[in-house]
Amino acid sequence: MSDVSGKVNLLNFDHKSMREYLESIGEKPFRADQIMKWIYHFGYSDFEQMTNINKKLREKLQRNCIISAPDISEKQVSEDGTIKYALKLEGGQEVETVWIPENDRATLCVSSQVGCALECTFCATAQQGFNRNLSMAEIIGQVWRVANDIGATRIAGTRPITNIVMMGMGEPLLNMKNLIPALDTMLNDLGYGLSKRRVTVSTSGVVPALDMLKAKIDCALAISIHAPNNKLRDELVPINKKYPLEDFIAAAGRYIEGSKANKQATIEYVMLDHVNDSTDQAHELAHALKGLPSKINLIPFNPYPGSPYSRSSNSRIDRFDKVLQSYGLTVITRRTRGEDIDAACGQLAGDVFDRTKRSVINAAKNAEISSLKNQPKADTISIKVV
């Protein structure tokens, strides 16, 4: 829970653990409620600004605690108003977060990991490989940092963050330990107070974790399918070899059963030209989804350097859409946002990968140089930078 300063980062606590921490240092648990309001409603990180907390406690917090979110290392604004943030983490790694304003809402796309281990062949993040899970502070800190940057605290009263989607870098369900308390803070009235239907977790098919999520928290669900059968999905989404499509769809059905956040699951389907976009495949997809209450988001593929795929033509997308609608399915073709700054779906990584890789290599070199200085002269040391 501590950062490099040795202080406890309060962004690593949800409401329950914040109360437990305050009790552990001899304070009344209601103080946690006050502190959370200052952090998330006002966007404060300075304990001296928390004026309804007595001076003695403020001084104790100042000595032992910190409110630390990832810093903005780069900010790019798209022609359509979308903003992509590169946020710097401890250790020099970076993740990307995207704020997408629309007429009646503003959605924040949040990352859960540095890189991703699932190796989906059409996704830029997957090409980066997996580095590590984000801490709770690094997940909720993305929301806190962007909210402060755009002035979207409750007190400011400006354009708020109305929706959060866990659709950034990484597979959220492979970081359950830190995802759950972060989601709780997004939903809790002492945190961001969003409704269950406005916080969405997207998964590519970690079936056991999806069942665990149901037992832990109720929020909106999006499932990334991208293929109508196991043969093609094995190629596009390799985790399908472990958890086949029919098991994934069944798990989604179990999740939305009894859910107050979901009347239906959102199906994410990236449109790859002449790969998964034929009318025959549309029929096959409709049959695969039979029995699952769902709406389908068709996502035009967003190209990135080195990708072997192309975006489906509008005519192929339209034909695919019409076939699905003929089965009575609700279908939406997602409008691509932030493409000019590589902030669109499937594009997150880019320069962040290059900077992260350089920072890791430099850190490794510095560590090896330091160890060399501390070794006896007679020793022979082999240095290998990965």
Curated annotation (Swiss-Prot):
Which EC class is the enzyme in?
transferase
Q: Which keywords does the record carry? A: 4Fe-4S, Cytoplasm, Disulfide bond, Iron, Iron-sulfur, Metal-binding, Methyltransferase, rRNA processing, S-adenosyl-L-methionine, Transferase, tRNA processing
Q: Which annotated residues bind [4Fe-4S] cluster?
A: C116, C120, C123
Disulfide bridge partners, by residue number: C109-C345
PROSITE patterns xrefs: RADICAL_SAM (PS51918)
Quick one: where is this thing mainly located?
cytoplasm
Name it: Dual-specificity RNA methyltransferase RlmN
